[in-house]
Amino acid sequence: MVHFTAEEKAIITSLWAKVNVEETGGEALGRLLVVYPWTQRFFDNFGNLSSASAIMGNPKVKAHGKKVLSSLGEAVTHMDDLKDAFAHLSELHCDRLHVDPENFRLLGNVLVIVLAHHFGREFTPQVQAAWKKLMSAVAIALGHKYH
């Protein structure tokens, strides 16, 4: 289990309060699909994913990105018990969707980049470290059912 300090929790929740879930989620998922094109196979019902511009403008990508990032809100509010908070999603992605758990880590890395882009100077190395720690812990929690 990952332990978050009071300072890390404050950093994460403070930034999360400013995140535009719809915009950031769509951008993060879109970037994942562009940068790691093999992840597109999990979204074959999303229509046109033939180019970066098609992916970034795809309404289904944006909608699912919002859904993914909304789920991340659970991580922010349940940092002390991520395994239980993500048990259902871990089971879904393992048993039904058969998503490679490495993709959770990749999405976390992409999200950190998107947050850095959106928040600029406010996204200090300390903020980056806290968010990287959270995203790593979320990836572990989502991959729990696989082990």
Curated annotation (Swiss-Prot):
One example GO MF annotation: hemoglobin alpha binding
Tissue: Red blood cells.
Region forming the signal peptide: none
InterPro entries xrefs: Globin (IPR000971), Globin-like_sf (IPR009050), Globin/Proto (IPR012292), Hemoglobin_b (IPR002337), Hemoglobin_oxygen_transport (IPR050056)
Chain positions recorded as heme b binding sites: 64, 93
Keyword annotations: Heme, Iron, Metal-binding, Oxygen transport, Transport
The Globin domain, residue ranges: 3-147
Recorded GO CC terms: blood microparticle; haptoglobin-hemoglobin complex; hemoglobin complex
Ranges in coiled-coil conformation: none
PROSITE patterns named among the record's database cross-references: GLOBIN
Gene Ontology BP, a term: hydrogen peroxide catabolic process
Pfam families linked to this entry: Globin
Gene3D superfamilies documented for this protein: Globins (1.10.490.10)
Quaternary context: Heterotetramer of two alpha chains and two gamma chains in fetal hemoglobin (Hb F).
Family per similarity comment: Belongs to the globin family.
Function: Gamma chains make up the fetal hemoglobin F, in combination with alpha chains.
Protein known as: Hemoglobin subunit gamma
